[in-house]
Structure formats: C-alpha cells, structure tokens
Regions:
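A cross-family phosphate/adenosyl-ligand binding-site feature
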Residues: 1-60, 64-128
Length: 128
C-alpha cells in the first residue's frame, strides 16, 4: 500500500485493459475520505482513488462510520462533487433478508450496479 509507483498510481494503468475500470473502497474510513478529499495521497489507496477521480472513472466509496461530523460531511460532499459515489453501508431490510449473508449479497448487488457489473443478486422490484 506504500508503493506509489505501482500500476494503480497511474492513469495509463487504469486505461490499459479492454474493460472499463472502476475502483471500489469497501470499507472506506473517514480517514481515507479525508485524505482523498484533500488530495493528500499518502499511500497507494489514496493515490489510486485520486487517479480514478482525475480520469473520471467510477469510484465507489462504501463508508462505515456514524455518526458523521460536519467535517466528514464536507469531505463526502467534496468527493461527490468530484464524481465519487458515496454509499454508506446501510443495508435494505425491505427485501426481508433471511440472514446476514442475504443482507450482504443484496448490498454487494447495489455496489455492482454502480459500476455496471452484471450479477444475479436480489434487487428491489417494488411493492408486491
């Protein structure tokens, strides 16, 4: 995570494949949010997220902390305005998951939807 010369630190690396690239930060701490929002790329994760934003590639940040301070909210807004998708880990109980595994699968499906990955996981289909 400290090798700022690794492939993901370069926009060329992201554009090298035949498939569109995306970056998922799961889970994403408020420390990481703050570093990326401020442009302080202290490690490869921060730098790769910075590159994803500058290259206009999908960046999905699944945040895990609550409650949120005003500083957290400003940082999240800054990242959203820069193009990131902010997804607090808030599972949907309206699908009535039978257990934690179903709950996690459904949330993973929502993450996959954000980056255009095809999947067969449960989706909300409206009221029955």
């Amino acid at each position: 995570a400290e090798d700022l010369g690794a492939g993901p630190a370069s926009g060329s690396w992201w554009r090298g494949g035949s498939e569109p690239a995306a970056m998922l930060l799961v889970p994403c701490s408020m420390g990481t949010v703050g570093a990326i929002a401020s442009g302080a790329t202290r490690n490869l994760v921060h730098r790769a997220a910075d590159v994803a934003l500058k290259e206009r590639l999908p960046l999905v940040m699944v945040t895990r902390e609550s409650p949120l301070s005003a500083i957290h909210l400003r940082n999240l807004l800054s990242l959203r305005e820069a193009g990131a998708v902010i997804m607090p880990f808030s599972p949907c109980f309206y699908l009535r998951p039978a257990g934690v595994e179903e709950l996690l699968e459904q949330f993973c499906g929502r993450i996959f939807d954000q980056v255009g990955l095809t999947h067969g996981l449960a989706r909300w289909a409206g009221q029955e």
